[in-house]
A protein has these predicted regions:
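Metal-dependent catalytic cores of enzymes that make or break cyclic nucleotides
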Residues: 1-149
Length: 149
């Protein structure tokens, strides 16, 4: 609500947030739990999941409006994200929000390949990557309104 989104936009954001990784069903699940570094080929496979998710969602009339949010949820403000490498304002607001929430969730959960961070460590990581990986204003709203810091 801090972002002046309509009820429909909020509903679509919630749905896209729940389905943002649906494209992972098209990727070998062992890659997501692999200990150690991924090969270039394995990393390329993982980077396909937003495209796969986009294809799945746009083929279902009810989900077509959110397909683009899923497609761009790994894009970065500096254009170094994937799958398209688009910058800043060209990335949908909803995708930018999903990117931040997804990153925070990953940082604060146990993963086989990386230790989880505390809430304060994750907040510092979000701030450190603000303006490059994440939209700075959205990071500030997330920390203040969602995390209550």
């Amino acid at each position: 609500r801090s972002l002046n989104m309509s009820e429909t936009e909020i509903r679509d954001l919630k749905t896209a947030g729940l389905l943002h990784d649906i494209g992972k069903i098209g990727i070998d699940k062992q890659l997501f739990n692999k200990n150690g570094n991924l090969s270039d080929s394995e990393w390329s496979d993982i980077r396909r999941h937003p495209d796969i998710g986009y294809q799945i969602l746009r083929s279902v009339d009810e989900f077509a409006p959110i397909a683009e949010y899923v497609l761009h949820h790994h894009e970065r403000i500096d254009g170094k994200g994937y799958p398209r490498g688009i910058k800043g304002d060209k990335t949908p607001l909803q995708s930018k929000i999903i990117n931040i929430v997804n990153a925070y969730d990953k940082m604060t959960r146990y993963r086989s390949y990386k230790d989880k961070l505390s809430k304060s460590e994750a907040i510092e990581e979000l701030k450190r990557n603000s303006g490059t990986q994440f939209d700075q204003g959205l990071v500030e709203v997330f920390i203040k309104r969602v995390l209550g810091e």
